[in-house]
A protein has these predicted regions:
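Q-loop/switch helix immediately C-terminal to the Walker
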Residues: 82-103
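Hydrophobic anchor residue at the start of the ABC signature
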Residues: 146
Length: 231
């Protein structure tokens, strides 16, 4: 991230923002001049082709929000040799002592197990908590990653393609659950129909610029074609 210029919240409704910011990674500037405001309570979908800067923007937003944001990364970042339960539990490692975490690794805490079991059931993972993550399907692993983010119990959900490995019907249900459990959501997606159906603001990115920023109810899938047009 390079020369990130942030905007201090000016009103109670202001959550985060960038004012003529330069954002990038590995000495590569992705956004040379980004201005963006995000308000509390918004449901925002980031759309655009691969490589246009969605992940860069989410990383900058995560840095700005700190422990307000629950993070669900694109690559899941799960520990393959640990169980689904332990991967979900990792969402709240910082809430427990090192000793408690070590004991839980050997013998799951009863209260944590019950809470995570209830969460897993809502995500269709019941019966899979003891299974190693590397023995789960791609869609199941993605739901474990979502469960870990939900278990963090933070007001803002930040997701990088959190439903990319599930079918549209499952994706819709997962997005409903994510929206129900968080006051604010900012999610990168590639499924435009899901974005229009489950988010109230669409931000379209291309070549380091915001080229669409509009209420979802004012847009159709065809309006988003410009985001995916060949160079």
């Amino acid at each position: 991230m390079l020369e990130t210029a942030t905007v201090e919240p000016g009103t109670p409704a202001m959550l985060a923002g960038f004012d003529h910011a330069r954002l990038g990674h590995d000495h590569h500037i992705v956004f040379p001049d980004l201005t963006l405001r995000i308000s509390q309570g918004e449901r925002i979908a980031l759309l655009g082709r691969s490589g246009v800067g969605k992940s860069t923007l989410l990383d900058a937003l995560r840095a700005q929000l700190g422990d307000q944001g629950a993070w669900c990364p694109q690559a899941n970042a799960l520990v393959p040799v640990l169980s689904a339960y332990h991967n979900i539990y990792m969402g709240r490692l910082a809430h427990f002592s090192r000793w408690q975490n070590l004991i839980n690794l050997l013998r799951p805490n009863r209260a944590c197990w019950q809470e995570i079991s209830a969460l897993a059931e809502t995500l269709g993972l019941d019966g899979l908590l003891r299974r190693q993550v590397d023995q789960l399907s791609g869609g199941q692993q993605q739901r474990v990653a979502i469960a870990r983010a939900l278990y963090q119990k933070r007001p803002v959900f930040i997701g990088d393609e959190p439903v990319a490995s599930v079918d549209p019907r499952q994706g819709a249900r997962l997005l409903e659950l994510i929206n129900e459990r968080h006051h604010t959501c900012v999610v990168a997606l590639h499924q435009r129909e899901l974005a229009l159906a489950h988010f109230d603001r669409i931000i379209g990115l291309d070549d380091g610029r915001i080229i669409i920023d509009a209420p979802a109810h004012e847009l159709t899938p065809n309006d988003l074609d410009v985001l995916y047009a060949p160079d």
